[in-house]
């Protein structure tokens, strides 16, 4: 083999070695986009439209505990796209949620939001996490569910209605309560790690914690205390009166109908402004 031939072969191998990481990254990106195109079936918009409202600016008495902006969630870390603990919703859904809250205030209760608009990148973050073996939060969030079943049982999906801006996760708090007098024990040991903390904060007992990947989270589940059943019924009734439809596998999950953006999935990050 001549010297020139050896040099050409060497340069070819060097070029291949330099370009390999880019090729792999391109394939991974194409695969991710393939998942988006296949499962979303709608437009993905990277910017926040002016028609999205910051809910707590419409009514500051709506409480907020945006878990995905912290490590207090089933992944155990802040989720991609959640740069601030802020609740955004498309305008019709935001205004309707305020109406729900105001109706509840007259009954001695108020809304607390756990998740509102969710960037598409956050859903992708959930998907990537679900495909790993990491399960540090299993005891708290899915003690009776194998992680490999999270897709099949509908707890995690490759796209989310939250990204369309009209779906919200909520609970209720009591307007008048004495934190020092808050007591009691959970009626079961499944997804109850925040029981004492939530009662001390005035949150109502719904029989399972938010984001509990378990059959106990089914809205009409029978194996609940009467108090938890009544609280779920109160929440569903109040939300339904203003156009929110409950997802029957999760007592906290509601979608405003008709959706303002039924075929659009947004991906702008959640920031203070």
Over which residues does each language-model region extend?
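Bacterial N-terminal signal peptides
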Residues: 10-21
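N-terminal cationic amphipathic segment used for targeting or macromolecule association
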Residues: 5, 21-25
């Amino acid at each position: 083999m001549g010297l020139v031939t050896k040099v050409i072969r060497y340069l070819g191998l060097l070029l291949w070695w330099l370009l390999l990481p880019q090729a792999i990254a391109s394939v991974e990106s194409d695969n991710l986009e393939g998942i988006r195109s296949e499962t979303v079936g709608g437009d993905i918009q990277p910017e926040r439209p002016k028609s999205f409202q910051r809910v707590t600016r419409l009514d500051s008495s709506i409480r907020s505990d945006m878990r995905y902006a912290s490590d207090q969630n089933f992944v155990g870390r802040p989720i991609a796209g959640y740069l601030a603990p802020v609740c955004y919703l498309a305008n019709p859904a935001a205004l309707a949620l305020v109406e729900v809250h105001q109706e509840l205030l007259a009954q001695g209760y108020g809304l607390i939001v756990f998740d509102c608009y969710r960037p598409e990148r956050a859903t992708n973050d959930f998907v990537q996490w679900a495909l790993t073996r990491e399960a540090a939060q299993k005891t708290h969030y899915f003690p009776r569910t194998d992680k490999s079943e999270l897709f099949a049982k509908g707890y995690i999906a490759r796209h989310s209605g939250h990204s369309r801006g009209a779906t919200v996760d909520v609970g209720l708090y009591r307007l008048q309560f004495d934190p020092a007098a808050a007591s009691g024990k959970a009626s079961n040991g499944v997804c109850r790690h925040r029981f004492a903390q939530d009662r001390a904060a005035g949150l109502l007992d719904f029989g399972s914690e938010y984001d509990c990947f378990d059959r106990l989270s089914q809205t009409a589940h029978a194996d609940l205390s009467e108090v938890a059943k009544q609280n779920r019924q109160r929440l569903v009734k109040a939300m339904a009166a203003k156009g929110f439809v409950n997802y029957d596998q999760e007592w906290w999950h509601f979608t405003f109908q008709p959706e303002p953006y039924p075929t659009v999935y947004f991906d702008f990050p959640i920031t203070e402004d």
